[in-house]
């Protein structure tokens, strides 16, 4: 058998292990945990009572963890075996990590959700409406938390006339559930009294899933569902969705977001009020103008009934009669003129007048011919068409004409006409 080099044997081990252990799930205790702040990668060992194996959790997978990885924690890791040939080391490259018994917790939560769903805890018809202008709001949180400070700041900016009352509550760890339940019951006890709260907001900032898991407890769900006061759940960040979010009347992604959702904006309402004021002024001006026009109409009506106005109306009627008389006179004269023109036309078409007219036209033509002869040059000729004198420029191609002077008379046809 040929000897293998160290590199060759490590390469073969790498190929064998990585092909064989593509997916492994290993449970153990976290030890030697190191989290690099710059890269975001985590390195640790997983151990039990007899053995240890190194693990890596790269930044992309580390950011997906639903809890904070801690030294000494019992976890189950899911990943693949990887080998580093230069040192002959092998390790688990982790894809997912869950706390020990996390699977059983998830199953229990799903069963609880189904139980509450059947009881109507998630039904929209059981949700209370959000108050439009809250005057007094109970904030269930830790009075020393950043969440409480942020909520106060945003509330003062948006709706400073609202009173926020912090009910100091334990928001994580042992005793958290009981503390939250008691605070909800206390705030709701003011319902329908002079000091009643318009809303109850259960709020805390982000954290690991272990820190937030208390808000998946059935006792908190019962307290929110039984409350007669409108309730909001504002736990963790946008990506954190807990049972309290589903049971409360309304969910907010963060404590600050709860104030933005619950409280109206004073600036927006100031703008709306300014708009209402302008509309009111316009409406008043329009109404005032309408009333003024109506009064002027009434005054005019009264004036028409006065004696002076009656006299004025009679004068107008007399003027109208004068105009009508003038129009009738003009119409009569037009009729007379038309009649005279008709008689004149009839006379002009009588046989006697027609004969005299024809005779007059013949004499006029003879006179024109004689006048033309007087102007003829020595070798010239008089041009006529149909016994009518005609100028050369009036002739057209094809016209039949007569030429005559003292010595002769001739007929001709026009072949062309050239005008100067």
UniProtKB/Swiss-Prot annotation:
Belongs to the XseA family. It holds the Pfam family tRNA_anti_2. Heterooligomer composed of large and small subunits. Bidirectionally degrades single-stranded DNA into large acid-insoluble oligonucleotides, which are then degraded further into small acid-soluble oligonucleotides. One of its GO terms (molecular function) is exodeoxyribonuclease VII activity. InterPro entries: Exonuc_VII_L, Exonuc_VII_lsu_C, OB-fold_nuc-bd_dom. NCBIfam families: xseA (TIGR00237). It is an enzyme of class 3 (hydrolase). One of its GO terms (cellular component) is exodeoxyribonuclease VII complex. Keywords: Cytoplasm, Exonuclease, Hydrolase, Nuclease. It is found in: Cytoplasm. This is Exodeoxyribonuclease 7 large subunit. GO terms for biological process: DNA catabolic process. CDD domains: ExoVII_LU_OBF (cd04489). Its main location: cytoplasm.
């Amino acid at each position: 058998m040929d000897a293998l080099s160290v590199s060759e044997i490590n390469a073969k081990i790498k190929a064998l292990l990585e092909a064989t252990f593509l997916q492994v799930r290993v449970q153990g205790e976290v030890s030697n945990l190191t989290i690099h702040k710059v890269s975001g990668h985590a390195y640790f060992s997983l151990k039990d009572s007899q053995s240890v194996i190194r693990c890596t959790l790269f930044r992309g997978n580390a950011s997906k963890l639903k809890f904070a990885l801690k030294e000494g924690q019992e976890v189950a890791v899911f990943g693949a075996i990887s080998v580093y040939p230069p040192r002959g080391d092998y390790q688990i490259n982790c894809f997912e990590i869950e706390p020990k018994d996390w699977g059983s917790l998830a199953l229990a939560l799903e069963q609880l959700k189904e139980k509450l769903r059947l009881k109507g805890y998630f039904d929209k018809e059981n949700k209370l409406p959000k108050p439009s202008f809250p005057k007094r709001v109970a904030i269930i949180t830790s009075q020393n938390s950043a969440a409480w400070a942020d909520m106060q700041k945003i509330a003062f900016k948006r709706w400073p006339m609202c009173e926020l009352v912090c009910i100091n509550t334990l928001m994580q760890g042992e005793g958290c559930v009981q503390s939250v339940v008691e605070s909800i019951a206390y705030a709701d006890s003011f319902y329908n009294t002079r000091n009643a709260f318009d809303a109850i907001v259960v709020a805390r900032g982000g954290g690991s899933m272990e820190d937030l898991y208390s808000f998946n407890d059935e006792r908190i769900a019962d307290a929110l569902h039984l409350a007669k006061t409108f309730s909001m759940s504002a736990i963790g960040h946008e990506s954190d969705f807990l049972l309290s979010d589903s049971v409360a009347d309304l969910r907010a992604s963060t404590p600050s977001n709860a104030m933005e959702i619950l409280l109206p904006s004073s600036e927006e309402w100031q703008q709306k009020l300014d708009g209402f004021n302008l509309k009111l002024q316009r409406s008043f001006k329009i109404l005032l103008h309408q009333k003024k026009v109506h009064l002027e109409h009434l005054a005019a009506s009264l004036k028409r009934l006065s004696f002076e106005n009656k006299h004025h109306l009679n004068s107008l009627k007399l003027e109208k009669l004068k105009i009508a008389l003038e129009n009738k006179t003009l119409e009569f004269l037009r009729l007379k003129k038309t009649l005279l023109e008709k008689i004149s036309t009839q006379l002009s078409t009588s046989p006697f007048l027609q004969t005299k007219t024809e005779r007059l036209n013949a004499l006029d033509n003879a006179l024109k011919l004689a006048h033309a002869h007087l102007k003829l040059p020595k070798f010239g000729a008089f041009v006529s068409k149909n016994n009518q004198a005609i100028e050369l420029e009036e002739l057209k191609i094809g016209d039949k004409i007569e030429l005559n002077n003292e010595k002769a008379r001739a007929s001709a046809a026009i072949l062309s006409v050239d005008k100067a």
